[in-house]
């Protein structure tokens, strides 16, 4: 049968005799409920929209290849990095964060940077952003951030007041806010931005020696950004500009590439680090912990069906392979639960069987998961009729002790420790970042901040000016001027203690 001569069937293979005219009682009569095809189509249509992601709802994705270019086996025995030249299939998804599925691509927002590597030891998901830091360092605040940047419960509109009230109520957010208000808060598209694992992770080698690492992905297309005015003009013509750019580039054979690097910190260095090395609001300075090249990934194949491969792509930081591991980063620890849990709600417990999520490097035929049943369990025969318990006399579900990780270093008593008593150095790094900007770039930070804070209350504006001033007096004065506020009217020595306690 020719491709253009496919004949319509129902979902269970029955031929459809008429796809335009319903079955009725007479030519002008009411619809008959025995019109099985109509019932099937409408009931499926009523259920075809799945829950969108709570964050990162609007996204674009592509398949590609990761290639090792430098030997890092002294740090890790992960097979993906076992030899120079080794290639691994992968999938990448880029996204905005705050907007819904129908939001414009060009918003002043963080961009998600999620990678899935199909290794022979299972899928490795690295769920990052285009910024190296985040707004806070304890995952208990994540629900509040989500609500603050989404729609107001009364007006159902995005609220700069809610957004900035939250951001300025959490002083450690200034580092991320500074990046967001800078040129890099509005990437031209997904191809022209860097990516970061953001969190601190760890690696271990054959000797069981552990090091702490941060992942960096540097675009080989160069960094390009838009101003607010440029972005607004483009959004008026094309709300999918970033998605279109990525898709068209790959279709035209202009495959985007990113180089992968790591920063490495030993356990001894971590003990003596001046700040908490697992604090997601801070970076490790490259002068102290230089970038080490690892490899390069290239995106070279567009999905054949967006829903199948991009909308149903499920990432979770718990998807990690031998040789790689986690860290005490409190935000990472929270995400270890929330991501997988969200995917099970959104896609079901068997979402690992969806093609884009399948562990292709292992092969379904080589897997032996203990989980059974659940909606849409079909791919592996539900493990057949063998034992569904352990131990059993068939020897099924044997552990693989050769993959046991080295001991994870922890200490201390279980307690709700006040993070602000441990570290209140919120402003040093954003101050250094501000001073690295050119004069023109600083002016754009001031302008972008004023644009973003339009309609925000005076007390919240004062709070932000105070934080900026503590990072660098020039920063605070510039923001105050852009907001048309006399800096002499701002309490520059105040604190956020009372505000924070209200969260």
From Swiss-Prot:
GO process annotations (BP): hydrogen peroxide catabolic process; response to hydrogen peroxide
Binding site for heme: 339
Residue span of region Disordered: 1-26
Reactions listed under catalytic activity: 2 H2O2 = O2 + 2 H2O
Family classification: Belongs to the catalase family.
The EC number(s) this enzyme carries: 1.11.1.6
EC category: oxidoreductase
Organism listed in the record: Staphylococcus haemolyticus (strain JCSC1435)
Keywords: Heme, Hydrogen peroxide, Iron, Metal-binding, Oxidoreductase, Peroxidase
Residues the record marks as active site: 56, 129
Pfam families: Catalase, Catalase-rel
Function statement: Decomposes hydrogen peroxide into water and oxygen; serves to protect cells from the toxic effects of hydrogen peroxide.
GO MF annotations, alphabetized: catalase activity; heme binding; metal ion binding
One GO CC annotation: cytoplasm
Taxonomic path: Bacteria, Bacillati, Bacillota, Bacilli, Bacillales
This protein's name: Catalase
Assembly mode: Homodimer.
Cofactor(s) needed by this chain: heme
């Amino acid at each position: 049968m020719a491709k253009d001569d496919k004949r319509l069937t129902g979902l269970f293979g029955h031929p459809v005799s008429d796809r335009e005219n319903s079955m009725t009682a007479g030519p002008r009569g009411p619809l008959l409920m025995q019109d099985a095809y109509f019932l099937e189509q409408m009931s499926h249509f009523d259920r075809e929209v799945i829950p969108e992601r709570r964050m990162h709802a609007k996204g674009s994705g592509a398949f590609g290849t990761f290639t090792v270019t430098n030997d890092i086996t002294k740090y890790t025995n992960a097979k993906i990095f076992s030899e120079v030249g080794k290639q691994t299939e992968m999938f990448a998804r880029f996204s905005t964060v705050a907007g819904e599925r129908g939001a414009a691509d060009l918003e002043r927002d963080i961009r998600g940077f999620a990678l899935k590597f199909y290794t022979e030891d299972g899928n490795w998901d690295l769920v990052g952003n285009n910024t190296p830091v985040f707004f806070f360092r304890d995952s208990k605040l994540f629900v509040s951030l989500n609500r603050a940047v989404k729609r107001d419960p009364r007006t159902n509109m995005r609220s700069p007041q809610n957004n900035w009230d939250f951001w300025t109520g959490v002083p450690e957010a200034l580092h991320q806010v500074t990046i967001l208000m800078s040129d890099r808060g509005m990437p031209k598209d997904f191809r022209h931005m860097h990516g970061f694992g953001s969190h601190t992770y760890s690696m271990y080698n054959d000797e069981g020696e552990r090091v702490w690492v941060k992942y960096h992905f540097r675009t080989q297309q160069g960094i390009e950004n838009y101003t607010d005015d440029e972005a607004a003009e483009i959004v008026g013509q094309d709300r999918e500009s970033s998605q279109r750019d990525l898709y068209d580039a790959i279709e035209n054979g202009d495959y985007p590439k990113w180089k992968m690097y790591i920063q490495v910190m030993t356990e001894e260095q971590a003990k003596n680090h001046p700040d908490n090395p697992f604090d997601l609001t801070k970076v490790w300075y490259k002068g102290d912990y230089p970038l080490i090249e690892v490899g390069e990934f290239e995106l070279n194949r567009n999905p054949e069906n967006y829903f199948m491969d991009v909308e149903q792509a499920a990432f979770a930081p718990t998807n990690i392979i031998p040789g790689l591991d986690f860290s005490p980063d409190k935000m990472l620890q929270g995400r270890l639960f929330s991501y997988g849990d969200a995917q099970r709600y959104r896609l079901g417990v068997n979402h690992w069987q969806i093609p884009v999520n399948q562990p292709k490097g292992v092969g379904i035929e080589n897997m032996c998961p203990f989980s059974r049943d659940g909606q849409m369990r079909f791919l592996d025969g539900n493990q057949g009729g063998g034992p569904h318990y352990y131990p059993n006399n068939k020897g099924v579900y044997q552990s693989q002790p050769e993959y046991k990780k080295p001991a994870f270093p922890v200490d201390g008593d279980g307690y709700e420790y006040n993070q602000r008593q441990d570290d209140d150095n919120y402003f040093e790094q954003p101050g250094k970042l501000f001073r690295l900007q050119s004069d023109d770039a600083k002016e754009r930070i001031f302008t972008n901040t004023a644009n973003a804070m339009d309609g925000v209350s005076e007390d919240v504006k004062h709070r932000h000016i105070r934080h900026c001033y503590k990072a660098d007096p020039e920063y605070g004065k510039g923001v105050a001027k852009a907001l048309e506020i006399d800096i002499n009217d701002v309490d520059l020595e105040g604190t956020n203690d009372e505000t924070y306690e209200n969260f």
